[in-house]
């Protein structure tokens, strides 16, 4: 009851309702909101502080920046969505805010497109070395059937492609990446598809920017070869995987393409099946059957595993269960 009253009090102000309506349509910075609302940064920041403290908004750090979005976990998350639903669609102020929001998103898209064009050649060079992405995605979907995945954590999300693949069927998706430029591209891609149930965060796979959130599926899609300590990255991911949840590593079998190390910063030139399975077991996972997709010259492997233990109780995060044991 107290949290409900706190949330209602926090939202009971015109500007804060406008902020909730805007953040329901995507992740926004203080600068974005200042431009849209036509108010000073200190004033907007004060409103945001109140909404975050009430649990209506999430604040996601990204270096010196912070992005705000409607909360998707916690007791106040449903209240936030409910309040936005009561805001009249035809309100003139809300309509103007949306027009300005579209201008902000258009600028973001231009910046992301520029980054993509500068790097597309490099990405295409790597893609030519292995089987097409569509086949990899089809195999991943077979290992993680969409009807069985409700919440997904994609580590090293890049352009957000895996969130796009699963986004329409899951309740919630979170992507983590260390590249702000990649995150900018991912935000634009998710926004174009209207995937408001998915968002991305800045963070390191060795120290995930999560607290007591949990997921019933975790993916590492062609990213573990960048890790200094792949076993540690898997252990960190398992902290946020529900008991009975599934984790899939998508990466290369051992190869001799040295240019991927020298020109593209790959730390590891593929992984042996046995070593990945040993990392799984050490992290409390039961390995499944490895799927190999031969290419020329690279073979993509999909290593599935299941976290030991019964399915988590509804509403009890994996990290919270771990903290109690």
List PLM regions with ranges.
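N-terminal helix-turn-helix DNA-binding core of bacterial DNA-binding proteins
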Residues: 2-43, 64-73, 139-141
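Amphipathic alpha-helical dimerization/coiled-coil segments
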Residues: 75-124
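Conserved alpha-helix/loop element of class I SAM-dependent methyltransferases that forms part
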Residues: 131-150
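Class I SAM-dependent methyltransferase SAM/SAH-binding core
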Residues: 153, 157-207
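A short acidic, Gly/Pro-enriched loop at the edge of an enzyme's catalytic core
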Residues: 206-218
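A short SAM/SAH-binding and catalytic strip from SAM-dependent methyltransferases
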Residues: 216-229
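A short glycine-rich, Lys/Arg-flanked "PGG" loop and its adjoining helix->strand segment in the class I
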Residues: 231-246
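C-terminal alpha-helical "lid/dimerization" subdomain adjacent to the S-adenosyl-L-methionine
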Residues: 246-304
